[in-house]
Design a protein with these regions (language model features):
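Short gly/ser-rich loop at a beta-strand->alpha-helix junction or flexible surface loop bordering the NTP-binding
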Residues: 1-191
């Protein structure tokens, strides 16, 4: 026996189907069932989307935020492609242009928008609830108001669409309650 470290082939998945266990053990990521326990790390979440990632694609927005922090998987794969290539694949949403190096990070050889850039892009272009939630997630993961505003300042030209909205969301969310801890506080033995 050997552990499952990647997506199982369809024939193995078909043989292992059990309606009661599927919802506990598997989650659909871009239409492919993935074992939940493999999605507990950024590397595992990246592995779940890498097969669908176009060559030289940079993960953006909700996809990048999901890779970094987890949560419900994205319904589409959002990527930035050099040269403005487009895709007709229903699960792939492409954007033209390049991100500044300061707005990207590399995870297992794949370039991905930082938490700050992903949150800013969602705040600029996403639905209102998702926009506020993205900034709250960034705040809860230690991203400061200054970092978010500096990242927003990198959005120039066509990428400046939605910047006033994003700035307003950042100001409102970051001026509110103090950041919540990502991990629950440790029990204090003294009291």
């Amino acid at each position: 026996l050997s552990p499952v470290l990647d997506t199982l082939p369809p024939q193995d998945m078909q043989a292992l189907r059990c309606a009661e266990l599927d919802s506990r053990l598997l989650v659909s990521v871009l239409g492919n069932l993935q074992p939940v326990d493999l999605l507990r790390s950024a590397e595992g979440r990246l592995r779940a989307v890498i097969a669908a990632l176009p060559h030289q694609g940079v993960l953006l927005a909700s996809t990048a935020l999901w890779v970094h922090v987890g949560g419900p998987p994205p319904e589409t794969l959002e990527v930035c492609l050099p040269g403005g290539r487009r895709s007709r694949l229903p699960y792939l949403e492409t954007r033209r242009g390049r991100l500044p190096r300061s707005d990207t990070t590399v995870i297992n050889g794949v370039t991905c928008a930082t938490i700050a850039r992903a949150a800013v892009d969602i705040a600029r272009l996403g639905p209102p609830v998702a926009a506020v939630r993205a900034i709250m997630i960034a705040r809860d993961h230690g991203i400061s108001r200054v970092r978010l505003l500096l990242t927003l300042n990198h959005c120039r030209g066509a990428a400046s669409r939605g910047c006033p909205r994003a700035q307003h969301i950042i100001e409102e969310v970051m001026s509110g309650a103090p950041p919540r801890a990502v991990a629950p506080p440790e029990n204090d033995a003294d009291g």
